[in-house]
Swiss-Prot record:
The gene is het-Q1. GO terms for biological process: programmed cell death. Coiled coil: none annotated. Keywords: Cell membrane, Membrane, Necrosis, Transmembrane, Transmembrane beta strand. This is Gasdermin-like protein het-Q1. The lineage of its organism: Eukaryota, Fungi, Dikarya, Ascomycota, Pezizomycotina. Changing V236A: Does not affect ability to trigger cell death during the allorecognition process.
């Protein structure tokens, strides 16, 4: 499959994606892995058949990534330190009975120990080799303009700790009209509230891949070419860059979607920005 890719340099702003669960080095996050979903590392089309990357395309990104992580974790509103989604809804159950549920998850990510990072430049020659994979070819030709996401950066830390606290508050109110002598009809009500809270903590030591950088490519079936669309900057979990975030009371609050009734669901990934050097 011939390709035409825009030539991009190492310099510029980089978006690093942080998955909820870290993995052992080289298991899920691999340079050159082609993903169909940038938030799902298991969607790789070529995880076990990635072609070797020429040394001249590799670059050590440790200094800037390490500095970015240290800077973020030192701030009280760190994009890596917290995320607090919440979902509130009122359900009308009928018969004058109403119930409301407030549910959410607060999470924290702590990174310590030695931080290392490597990035590579997926130039035209490498993409030509990468796109010869039969699974990649099949996926690219399956649909019109389907995007592909290539892992072009991996960051590893000596110790990673993820802590999640889930909380659900339920309220139920029952109201009805009753007869009251002389005064006439009135209303009485009863409200009950119950709160449930659980905490889950996951730790990993001995070297873990905790972040990856993804570059998006679009394949044109008509022209038979692949276009480099730059770093993927889609949906994010943490504030700090482009993505579904809103300001509330002077604080940037993450926006979470795809909640299901009776379930609190966190997005699979977060992100942070790094200013790369040439």
């Amino acid at each position: 499959m011939p390709t035409k890719t825009s030539q991009h340099a190492f310099a510029g702003s980089e978006r690093w994606v942080v998955p909820r669960y870290s993995s052992k080095p080289g298991t899920l996050i691999r340079l050159g892995s082609v993903l169909t979903d940038p938030e799902d590392l298991e969607s790789s089309l070529n995880l076990d058949s990635i072609p070797p990357i020429p040394p001249h395309l590799l670059r050590d990104a440790t200094p800037e990534v390490r500095m970015s992580v240290q800077t973020e974790l030192s701030k009280s509103d760190s994009t890596l330190a917290k995320a607090a989604p919440a979902l509130e809804g009122i359900l009308t159950l009928g018969g004058g009975v109403e119930a409301s549920r407030s549910q959410g998850v607060s999470s924290s990510l702590n990174i310590s120990g030695t931080v290392k990072a490597t990035v590579f430049r997926a130039d035209k020659s490498y993409m030509d080799v990468l796109l010869k994979d039969k699974n990649v070819i099949s996926y690219a030709k399956r649909g019109l303009g389907k995007p592909m996401f290539v892992v072009v950066g991996v960051a590893t830390a000596g110790r990673v700790e993820m802590k999640e606290t889930r909380h659900v508050t339920r309220k139920a109110g029952v109201s009805g009209k009753v007869g009251v002598e002389v005064i006439g009809e009135g209303e009485v009500g009863l409200e009950r509230e119950r709160s449930d809270k659980s905490c889950n903590e996951v730790r990993g030591e001995g070297g873990l891949d905790f972040a990856y950088r993804v570059r998006e490519f679009g394949y044109s079936r008509v022209r038979g070419t692949v276009k480099d669309k730059g770093d993927w900057t889609g949906k994010v979990l943490f504030a700090g860059g482009k993505g579904p975030v809103v300001e509330k009371g002077g604080e940037v609050v993450p926006v979470f979607k795809e909640f299901k009734e009776g379930e609190v669901k966190l997005r699979a990934t977060g992100s942070f920005d790094v200013a790369a050097k040439a």
